[in-house]
Amino acid sequence: MKYTDKQPGELQEKLITVNRVSKTVKGGRVFSFTALTVVGDANGRVGFGYGKAREVPSAIQKSMEKARRNMVIISLYKGTLQHAVKGVYTGSRIYMQPASEGTGIIAGTTMRAILEVVGIHNVLAKAYGSTNPINIVRATINALQSMKSPEMIAEKRGKSISEILGYYNYVKHY
């Protein structure tokens, strides 16, 4: 695991993209900047924010504040995903699957930033369709939120956790 100066529980912030956008008015163009950021605690919490302002630092600050306000909790399993998941948002489709220890994060830059701040260390991920960063971020977070823990699946199916995880055949049942 990489050495960082961050304390456990402290939020990690990553800037994904900064764009210059313009609005055409009667006197010409008015330029402003947008920023897309993700924030996470490397332990299953992640949020993203999109900010817009006249100056870059203000846009980044706004997006960081929005990201901190919009955090969600993701259930992880040994530094990877519980199971393979798919996520969709408008024209972007993503697929992620768990990987064995030592694989690392094999994903595009936008997805990699999210997976790093959420605390996933081993995953295989692929984006299809539109690679617009905003859509990829939303699709990735949708996919992570759709992931279910074995406890949730067992409860939904009315079975024991050992049956869901495949330990059923190895344990004697009388």
Swiss-Prot record:
Keywords for this protein: Ribonucleoprotein, Ribosomal protein, RNA-binding, rRNA-binding
Query: GO cellular-component terms in the record?
Result: small ribosomal subunit
Which PROSITE patterns does the protein's record reference? RIBOSOMAL_S5, S5_DSRBD
An MF annotation (GO) of this entry = rRNA binding
Q: Which Gene3D superfamilies match?
A: 3.30.160.20, 3.30.230.10
Q: Which Pfam families match?
A: Ribosomal_S5 (PF00333), Ribosomal_S5_C (PF03719)
Residues of the S5 DRBM domain: 11-74
- Superkingdom, taxonomy of origin: Bacteria
Tell me one GO biological process term: translation
- Listed InterPro entries: Ribosomal_Su5_D2-typ_SF, Ribosomal_uS5, Ribosomal_uS5_bac-type, Ribosomal_uS5_C, Ribosomal_uS5_N, Ribosomal_uS5_N_CS, Ribsml_uS5_D2-typ_fold_subgr
Task: Identify its protein family.
Answer: Belongs to the universal ribosomal protein uS5 family.
NCBIfam families per record: rpsE_bact
Q: What is known of its domains?
A: The N-terminal domain interacts with the head of the 30S subunit; the C-terminal domain interacts with the body and contacts protein S4. The interaction surface between S4 and S5 is involved in control of translational fidelity.
Instruction: Write out the function statement from the record.
Output: With S4 and S12 plays an important role in translational accuracy. Located at the back of the 30S subunit body where it stabilizes the conformation of the head with respect to the body.
Subunit details for this protein? Answer: Part of the 30S ribosomal subunit. Contacts proteins S4 and S8.
Q: Mind telling me what this protein is named? A: Small ribosomal subunit protein uS5
Gene source species: Blochmanniella pennsylvanica (strain BPEN)
The gene that this protein is the product of is: rpsE
